[in-house]
Amino acid sequence: GQQPLCNDCFACARSLCICGDLVPQCHEGCQQCEKVDTLSGKPLYQCRSFEDYQCAN
């Protein structure tokens, strides 16, 4: 499916983007996101292309 462009997120990690919006969005260092299944059932989006970027929680 289509991979959305990433904009802003409220929590960032080296390779993960944790998004608070229904549409997956990451900080500007992340180029693309893909949804990852988790045991908790909470939506988790992994950054396919990641550039080092300081992101405050």
Curated annotation (Swiss-Prot):
Keywords: Disulfide bond, Protease inhibitor, Serine protease inhibitor
Single GO MF annotation: serine-type endopeptidase inhibitor activity
Classification via InterPro entries: Bowman-Birk_prot_inh
GO BP term, example: negative regulation of endopeptidase activity
Tissue/organ expression: Expressed in bulb (at protein level).
Site (Reactive bond for trypsin) residue list: R14, S15
Gene3D superfamilies membership: Cysteine Protease (Bromelain) Inhibitor, subunit H (2.10.69.10)
Gene Ontology cellular-component terms listed: extracellular region
Cysteines paired by S-S bonds: C6-C55, C12-C17, C26-C33, C30-C47
Function according to Swiss-Prot or TrEMBL: Serine protease inhibitor. Inhibits trypsin (Ki = 110 nM) and very weakly inhibits chymotrypsin (Ki =1200 nM). Does not inhibit bacterial subtilisin.
Family per similarity comment: Belongs to the Bowman-Birk serine protease inhibitor family.
Protein name, UniProt field: Bowman-Birk type proteinase inhibitor B4
The species this protein was found in: Hyacinthus orientalis (Common hyacinth)
